[in-house]
From Swiss-Prot:
GO molecular function: DNA binding; DNA-directed RNA polymerase activity; protein dimerization activity
SMART domains, A to Z: RPOLD (SM00662)
GO process annotations (BP): DNA-templated transcription
Domain of life of the source: Bacteria
Assigned GO CC terms: cytoplasm; DNA-directed RNA polymerase complex
Stated role: DNA-dependent RNA polymerase catalyzes the transcription of DNA into RNA using the four ribonucleoside triphosphates as substrates.
Name of the protein this chain belongs to: DNA-directed RNA polymerase subunit alpha
InterPro entries: DNA-dir_RNA_pol_insert, DNA-dir_RNA_pol_RpoA/D/Rpb3, DNA-dir_RpoA, RBP11-like, RNAP_asu_C, RNApol_insert_sf
Keyword field: DNA-directed RNA polymerase, Nucleotidyltransferase, Transcription, Transferase
Region (Alpha N-terminal domain (alpha-NTD)): 1-236
Catalytic activity: RNA(n) + a ribonucleoside 5'-triphosphate = RNA(n+1) + diphosphate
Record keyword Phosphoprotein present: no
Length: 330
């Protein structure tokens, strides 16, 4: 029975109709009125654009220097071969982000994905997928293919700009379509629960490349959506702490030697005799203290005061925590 008017019905997975190994229809009901389109559109966009998967991103074909060429004994030109490689459905074991697979074939006939040589960490989901055709018994083709894990769609031009090193001649880049979902559509039909007839039924029609089960695809898409909405569940004003620039403990001028003041020889020698080596040492002295220094008269005192004033300093200043550790260690 229906509870409070504020309670929402929770959908359940009603049926998975497996039309083929790569095509399925998934039905969820009941949904509150309007939620069929709300959830259907959100899941559709995530399934098309945000599902992680593996794709061919680079290939090296023996005897081929660039993509605008042909290869003797091969029916297709190189651009056609690259387009066919984009349709390769590859599943790579978790924990590996990139792998290399090889293809070596000779003799007349089609070259298919099942001819690819790989280790146990790689599975080809469409082994009958045609890559090219060899036209005579003496024809042969050899290629090294790089497969990478990623998300969404990344054109080859984007990777060209990101490459730090110059790309070797003969390494051909392929537009990468990582998503294992080829086609996705949804329909909203009427549903009924007891006396309520204004509910929605969501039917998702999905085709994949065979590397991901439809039920798992929806589960992953729903998880991505839920994670993105988590921020709205506990809506708070989360302030990012401002990065404060670390200010030096002392004005850098105080750490400079007294010699930088370019005093007369008489004044400089008097200060050194009193172990006043840094400007920070000097500004903490008072006029009375300096006048007690042997051989330092009023003329030298006036000189020191004028030089300090030109730098915005004066005698009798108080400096907390002086001297700093860097000077104390010296």
């Amino acid at each position: 029975m229906q509870g409070s008017v504020t309670e929402f019905l929770k959908p359940r997975l009603v049926d998975i109709e497996q039309i083929s190994s790569t095509h399925a229809k998934v039905t969820l009901e009941p949904l509150e009125r309007g939620f069929g389109h709300t959830l259907g559109n959100a899941l559709r966009r995530i399934l098309l654009s945000s599902m992680p998967g593996c794709a061919v991103i680079e290939v090296e074909i023996e005897g081929v220097l660039h993509e605008y060429s042909t290869k003797e004994g091969v029916q297709e030109d190189i651009l056609e071969i690259l387009l066919n490689l984009k349709g390769l459905a590859v599943r790579v074991a978790e924990g590996k982000d990139e792998v290399f697979i090889t293809l070596n074939k000779s003799g007349s006939g089609p070259v298919v994905a099942g001819d690819i040589t790989h280790d146990g960490d790689v599975e080809i989901a469409n082994p009958e997928h045609v890559i090219c055709h060899l036209t005579d018994d003496n024809a042969e083709i050899a290629m090294r293919i790089k497969v990478e894990r990623g998300r969404g769609y990344v054109p080859a031009s984007a990777r060209i700009h990101n490459e730090e090193d110059e790309r070797p001649i003969g390494r051909l880049l392929v537009d990468a379509t990582y998503s294992p979902v080829d086609k996705i559509a949804y329909a909203v039909e009427a549903a009924r629960v007891e006396q309520r007839t204004d509910l929605d039924k969501l039917v998702i029609d999905m085709e994949t490349n065979g590397t991901l089960e439809p039920e798992e695809a929806i589960r992953r898409a729903a998880t991505i959506l839920a994670e993105q909405l988590d921020a709205f569940v506990d809506l708070r004003d989360v302030r990012v702490p401002e990065e404060k620039e670390e200010k030096p403990e002392f004005d850098p001028i105080l750490l400079r030697p007294v010699d930088d003041l370019e005093l007369t020889v008489r004044s400089a020698n008097c200060l050194k005799a009193e172990a006043i080596h840094y400007i920070g040492d000097l500004v903490q002295r008072t006029e009375v203290e300096l006048l007690k220094t042997p051989n330092l008269g009023k003329k030298s005192l006036t000189e020191i005061k004028d030089v300090l004033a030109s730098r915005g300093l004066s005698l009798g200043m108080r400096l907390e925590n002086w001297p700093p550790a860097s000077i104390a260690e010296d």
